[in-house]
């Protein structure tokens, strides 16, 4: 985007991902704690109400998203945005935006990721399971957090909620004007917050900012 505001999200790399091909990749499924059998099971038959009631889990959530018959394509935008470090000094952080390739965007989901063990698992470096929500019309905003992505050389402030929440919200504030300038405006103004484990704590902290 020409003449982008300095505070906007800046794209470093972009690619289009075939979701159907992605969920049929055993290596990718393993990263999500899944297997090809999970995909085959969902495609073979609808999950019964009884299963639905007894399977409220991450795997059930994944099975709902792994219906390959309804998969389309997603656009992945990895980029950087301005935030602050632990001392309040300006810093560039990284993250990823995942949006439907062709369908209109319903609304944003701001995702705070769970605890990860290495930079290889940072959202900028993988396709997060939550990204499959694009098939339902959502655009995902997923920060790497300080200490991951382009700041992997720094110590991650694990469970220092105020700074992590600030970093997460700063990415949202940077992405929204970027998307508007690109002509990608959601149908609804309200956003969903999403997080699991460390991401759950971060999501609650974001609500207090």
Model-derived regions, located:
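Residue in the alpha/beta-hydrolase core beta-strand immediately N-terminal to the catalytic nucleophile
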Residues: 190-192
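Second-shell loop/turn segments in exported
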Residues: 129, 153-161
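Catalytic-loop region of hydrolases
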Residues: 1-104
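Secondary-structure boundary elements
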Residues: 102, 137, 173-185
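Gly/Ala-rich beta-loop-alpha elbow adjacent to hydrolase catalytic centers
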Residues: 195-199, 203
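Stable alpha-helical elements in mature extracytoplasmic
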Residues: 108, 129, 164-171, 202-206
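Short, surface-exposed "cap/lid" segments of acyl-processing enzymes
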Residues: 85-137, 144, 148-151
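Alpha/beta-hydrolase active-site loop
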Residues: 158-181, 208
């Amino acid at each position: 985007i020409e003449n982008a505001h300095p505070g906007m999200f800046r794209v470093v790399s972009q690619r289009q991902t075939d979701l159907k091909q992605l969920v049929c990749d055993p290596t990718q499924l393993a990263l999500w704690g899944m297997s090809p059998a999970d995909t085959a099971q969902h495609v073979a038959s609808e999950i019964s109400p009884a299963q639905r009631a007894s399977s409220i889990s991450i795997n059930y959530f994944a099975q709902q998203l792994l219906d390959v018959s309804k998969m389309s394509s997603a656009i992945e935008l990895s980029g950087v945005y301005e935030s602050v470090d632990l001392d309040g000094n300006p810093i560039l952080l990284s993250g990823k935006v995942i949006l439907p390739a062709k369908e209109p965007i319903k609304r944003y989901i701001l995702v705070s990721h769970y605890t990860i063990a290495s930079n290889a698992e940072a959202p900028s470096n993988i396709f997060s399971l939550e990204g499959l929500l694009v098939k339902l019309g959502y655009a995902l905003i997923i920060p790497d957090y300080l200490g991951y992505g382009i700041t992997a050389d720094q110590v991650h402030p694990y469970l220092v909620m105020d700074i992590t929440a600030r970093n997460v919200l700063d990415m949202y504030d940077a992405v929204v004007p970027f998307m508007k300038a690109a002509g990608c405006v959601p149908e609804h103004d309200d956003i969903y917050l999403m997080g699991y484990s460390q991401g759950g704590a971060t999501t609650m902290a974001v609500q207090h900012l």
